[in-house]
């Protein structure tokens, strides 16, 4: 019998001695028991097992979290599939980093108090009524032993930081959080921090998951220290407030041979594969959050919409995987299916639009696009954003807007076949092969060139009757970015061939005299034939990465050629 005894993590579930358990679905069966309360009490032994310790983790994987809670592979598979609903400290399993570029340090307090076990040998054989109770249930095991205690997790998360600062921030946080036990002096808080440590605590927050009832959950480092120091008292002098931590289960087949038994368990290797897939999908969602909180994304609803859509599709796919696992796992344990049916689902992912390679490539392209948009906006700061074509028209038709120039991102609203394939796959439709839509290196470099030129034009022509805007409006004819020039509310197509873009140069030619520009009537637009000069902007291109420095050369104004009457944005 000892060799068939199972041990499972309680995960803050309300286990009691003599309770039924269905190991096929990893679920408790409350309300049914083979013995009355007096019989259970008379046949229960108890031993004191007082202990406490703490651990620190900087990992956010399911593997590291389940290790802190001593969860074995089979129960982990049930949790990953959604068969097990966790409570108390085990809710920590569901807590994920919001951002990829975020430092996280977790402090765990673990305590044990006592162990209770049921003496099965003294309970005798079952009568017909007890056998009938077993047959009416779906139980496979009975609870015969429980280790009591409590867990508490203090999860410290930094604010979003730059990618190259994550490790440094994590190291600083870990060094400080490791000192928490030292702040407990005979049950009282002695919190002495340096100015540097005090400044550090302002850069991260705290979340609490525990088997303790606190007056209020801590949200700061100081509150976390105060809560930690008071935890031992909350267990009670005799551990009366402790909860089940670990449970021992004996198969019911030893009491009734007709009880269905657990035939197979999920292999550790397969559980790790499932874990990796689900963690990978969550990391993709976290990468999306990194981009979504960028200020420039909030300025462009089209960027926000496509990132949110990608994030939701990944979430739907993850839920779909879990739904399938809920059906397959019990069948494998009952011997009705083998592991190949579950492994096949994992393998199919790599052929689907949700493969790691395809999702990562899509995000790479989108993050690069966000970086370039950010770079352009940084070059032309303080320019008014207009949400769409309608708002742009309203601005350029305003009475005071004699001249209007709008820097247009022309490719942000392009349809995305990758997202369409993801949606079709979830709907059960066959997906065609597709590559992420991305803007070429040449176009990306031209976008920043045009932004520098636009900035030079703003500096030279700004005045009460000259307006400048930024917008995202689809225009497939000019990929990347373009400049729209309006005079008296009219878009001048002759000026740079509809919206002013010719690839390969950063020079700008305008048929507008700055002095005359500011003297013009707000009602009568000027003739578009004035020509005062050709302004050139030279740039030294550097890799288009977030927060990298862009080298710039001071713009030069070339000599004016009066014979050239064209107006072009090359």
Mark where each language-model region is.
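Intrinsically disordered, low-complexity basic segments at termini and long loops, enriched
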Residues: 515-569
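Intrinsic low-complexity, polar/charged intrinsically disordered segments
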Residues: 340-476, 480, 494
